[in-house]
């Protein structure tokens, strides 16, 4: 498949496939990158159906992994997602823009693209309630909201750093609007987001949910990837 590496306002990105009038913007998840296996599979399927794919590295991921001056915080990620969208509109003149997002990439997309004209959204193992995840990490690390506000950042024993500005942004920007045709693939053994939260999100925003029994948050086994490939048949 034809691929082209480009740079969008210092964001490393990749265009997959020949020039088309339709595109999927692909937003990867934590500890992933713009060339991840699930994005490769998406690009192959999308190309066969007449779409290009535009993927990019989130802060501190992929080609940006060693840049510690611009952290993978929600504010920065939302800013980057908006820049990618504007670039796609201005430079490629797509007639149709679609979205694929995984894990925390889905959460950033819900914030950045809520007012965008997106034809269809595909979410793999999405994070739809980031506050719940941060609240849990604060509980596990015995960190109170007051302590985090006072110290601004706290490094936990399990390796994650909690940031007050990140938490405050999440609290002040709840997901209240997502009026797009959306399909979600979720593993029943996802340890990042409870199934009830996913189902509540689907009911609230009329999303179509597919569940892989015994599937994990990280789709990586042959069985999981085969199920994922078949799920992508919704791309037409």
Q: Predicted segment positions?
A:
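N-terminal cap/lid segment of alpha/beta-hydrolase-fold proteins
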Residues: 1-19
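Short beta-strand element of the alpha/beta-hydrolase
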Residues: 21-29
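Short beta-to-alpha linker loops that shape the active-site pocket of alpha/beta-hydrolase fold enzymes
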Residues: 30, 57-64, 127, 215
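The serine-hydrolase catalytic nucleophile loop
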Residues: 31-43, 196
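Conserved alpha/beta-hydrolase
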Residues: 38-39, 43-66
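Catalytic nucleophile-loop/oxyanion-hole region of alpha/beta-hydrolase
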Residues: 62-92
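The alpha/beta-hydrolase serine catalytic core
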Residues: 72, 107, 117-200, 204-211, ...
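Gly/Ala-rich beta-loop-alpha elbow adjacent to hydrolase catalytic centers
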Residues: 100-109
